[in-house]
Amino acid sequence: MLKKFFKEISYKKSYVLAFSGGLDSTVLLHMISLYIKKIKNNNNFFKKIFKFRAVYINHNICKESKYWSNHCHDQCLKYKVFFKSINIFISDFSEGIESSARRERYKALFSDLNPEEVLITAHHQDDQIETILLSLKRGSGPRGISGMQSIKKFDSHIIKRPLLHCKKEDIKLYAIKHNLNWIDDKSNLNIKFDRNFLRSEIIPLLKKRWPNIGNTISRSAKLCFDQEKLLNELLKDTLNSLVEKDKSLKFIELFKMSEIKRFAILRKWFCLNNFKMPSLSQLKHIWKNVIISKKDSKAEIKINNNIIKRFKKNLYFIPIYSKNHLKNIIFKTSLNHSKKIVLPYDLGTLITKPIMINENFIKKINFFYYNNKKKFIFLINLNYMKKMSFTVKLWILFIC
């Protein structure tokens, strides 16, 4: 297992381990510490350019989380690995505890990554089986059944899973052999959660009946991944011709396609925007109630934390943000009346234009201060009702 691991890791990279203190990530931490010793013994120059640290995400859900953070810190101290604990607080559980925690965990990990760093996770073959079985339960297509990949690019970041082809039993034997100390999270025994149910009740039965099922499921996942990759190649040119610079989708050409190709294009558009794959019923709803609905209707559908909306001949992804989230955004930019100002979080673009104002207008303006001393910007928001059935918001900014 160590030989395979050393082949997966390059001393030229900078790595960040998602460290929970559990069995799997503890084994991975130990393996990396051995790798550091190995390259140090070979050449001290390698040690200098190989960078590695561990990050623990405290979800603040379990009362033991503080203890777990301390345990992870002690383990990293033992191996002389830089450690960081990040606190997150989940306010939206609409996707369920597991999915919501996973979403916020990865958001925190990616936010902490430097551009040159690769995120390492301790997912193994049994995790892959769970993921694929859950995809089958949801009725997923080839992309879902392809499961996790040993290397995956997500936006500008890379995730590496060097233990993905290792069996859970082998990982535990490794931990016992090296006398490792890890955390057993009792919540993993709660079978009301689907993943725990599969882990505790279903997968042991499958392995007992078919001992090699982990390898065969992984092989099927690889075949599905190859099919999905081929589909991407075949649809690439068509998709590129339909997607605008703002990532909106021109849907007129979809009317000329078969339903199979049309839905495949829509799925690829979701992937391009890094959003969760829609179900078949959601795709049908987008087509029937958004794309081909009446022009004067409010053609939109809410999927997770986004709204799919039609405007003229294009489909748009519009993120849903809470008012509190938007209030906390600090956005700095140089103001030039001849340029457009692109707002963060895909909130749109401001077109700047100089205007004449009077004294009464100035009295309505809100003042913002920098360090409570230097006045640097005025901001006002006015609503204008047009004859159309929508509201236009005008933001006026001044530099003092």
Swiss-Prot record:
Q: Which keywords accompany this UniProt record? A: ATP-binding, Cytoplasm, Ligase, Nucleotide-binding, tRNA processing
Enzyme Commission number(s): 6.3.4.19
Citing just one GO molecular function, the answer is: ATP binding
**Annotated GO biological process:** tRNA modification
Can you state which reaction this protein catalyses?
cytidine(34) in tRNA(Ile2) + L-lysine + ATP = lysidine(34) in tRNA(Ile2) + AMP + diphosphate + H(+)
Is Cytoplasm found in the keyword set? yes
Q: Which Pfam families would you find in this protein's record?
A: ATP_bind_3, TilS
Group of enzyme by EC: ligase
Q: Which InterPro entries match?
A: Rossmann-like_a/b/a_fold, TilS/TtcA_N, tRNA_Ile_lys_synt, tRNA_Ile_lys_synt_N, tRNA_Ile_lys_synt_subst-bd
A GO cellular component annotated for this chain's UniProt record is: cytoplasm
Q: What top-level branch of life does the organism fall under?
A: Bacteria
> Does the UniProt entry include the keyword rRNA-binding?
no
Free-text note regarding domains:
The N-terminal region contains the highly conserved SGGXDS motif, predicted to be a P-loop motif involved in ATP binding.
Q: Which PANTHER family match?
A: TRNA(ILE)-LYSIDINE SYNTHASE-RELATED (PTHR43033:SF1)
Q: Outline what the protein does.
A: Ligates lysine onto the cytidine present at position 34 of the AUA codon-specific tRNA(Ile) that contains the anticodon CAU, in an ATP-dependent manner. Cytidine is converted to lysidine, thus changing the amino acid specificity of the tRNA from methionine to isoleucine.
Q: What is this protein called?
A: tRNA(Ile)-lysidine synthase
